[in-house]
């Protein structure tokens, strides 16, 4: 295994459940020599990705916060989604929370969240908190579009949880359940994550057609019961916004590719022109020698 990969494994040990690690504990967990683990910790501390906590123990360092700020400001998915999330909330007509989630190592991770001014409820999809793929609208709509190879491994690992989530008791039933979700391109659940809350989610795709994540609205179950046709209206607007976001990502990618091709073409023309006329500096030197 490559050194960089092993070092990343050290970094991935740090979680909400285990936010602090010693070099000795990390070495045992990953099957490393203590001297090797020491080098990895030293390099991660030098990069400010880890900091010393109490004696012999380490926590995540300030560099993580710097990268988080860069992600918030520069991630094109977040930048393009936030105006759409605000529009979704403004047009909903009820108090709600808008979520932007991305797939992260076969979990779903909220990367941006917006709420209406008087939304008096919290949601479990907190920013930066990995959530399972088999519960909740924001997760299930992503799970339905995961590639088959990864899906089979995931099923074998979480077979019992998938069965409890009413997604099938066999591999065949599981595939059929996901096929039904894919066919609607929208998924709505009530009370699967938070009691009394309804989640309405649609998928977001990369320019290559791979599943990136989901765009969602969370409203109170009471609001949907008290307003006829509200779920249909919100479902339609969420699906439309997700489609628009996918299209914007594709357009941005196409623009960048066209710009890159144009730049390469310009450089190629300059090289061809230089080859035809000779290098300008060399030509100038030859002229100066002739004059002398």
Task: Set out the residue ranges of the language-model regions.
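Short, solvent-exposed recognition segments
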Residues: 120-193, 264-270, 277-283
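Sensor-regulatory modules in signal-transduction proteins
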Residues: 204-207
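N-terminal helix-turn-helix
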Residues: 1-74, 78, 243-248, 291-292
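An N-terminal domain-start capping segment
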Residues: 1-22, 26, 87-115, 239-261
């Amino acid at each position: 295994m490559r050194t960089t990969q092993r070092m990343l494994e050290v970094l991935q040990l740090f979680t909400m459940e285990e936010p602090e690690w010693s070099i000795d504990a990390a070495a045992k967990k990953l099957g490393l020599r203590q001297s090797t683990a020491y080098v990895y910790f030293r390099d991660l501390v030098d990069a400010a990705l880890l900091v010393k906590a109490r004696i012999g123990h380490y926590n995540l360092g300030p560099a993580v916060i710097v990268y988080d700020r860069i992600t918030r400001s520069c991630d094109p998915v977040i930048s393009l989604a936030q105006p759409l999330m605000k529009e979704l909330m403004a047009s909903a007509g009820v108090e709600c929370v808008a979520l932007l989630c991305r797939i992260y190592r076969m979990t779903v991770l909220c990367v941006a969240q917006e709420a209406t001014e008087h939304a008096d409820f919290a949601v479990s999809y907190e920013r930066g908190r990995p959530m399972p793929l088999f519960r909740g609208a924001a997760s299930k709509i992503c799970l339905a579009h995961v590639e088959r190879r990864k899906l089979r491994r995931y099923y074998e690992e979480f077979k019992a949880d998938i069965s409890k989530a009413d997604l099938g008791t066999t591999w065949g039933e599981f595939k059929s359940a996901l096929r039904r979700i894919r066919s609607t391109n929208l998924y709505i659940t009530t009370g699967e994550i938070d009691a009394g809350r309804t989640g309405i989610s649609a998928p977001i795709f990369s320019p290559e057609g791979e599943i990136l994540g989901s765009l969602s609205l969370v409203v109170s179950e009471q609001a949907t019961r008290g307003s006829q046709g509200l779920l249909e209206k919100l479902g339609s607007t969420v699906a439309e916004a997700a489609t628009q976001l996918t299209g914007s990502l594709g357009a941005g990618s196409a623009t960048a590719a066209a710009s890159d091709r144009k730049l390469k073409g310009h450089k190629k023309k300059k090289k061809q022109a230089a080859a035809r006329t000779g290098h300008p500096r060399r030509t100038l030197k030859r002229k100066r020698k002739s004059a002398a």
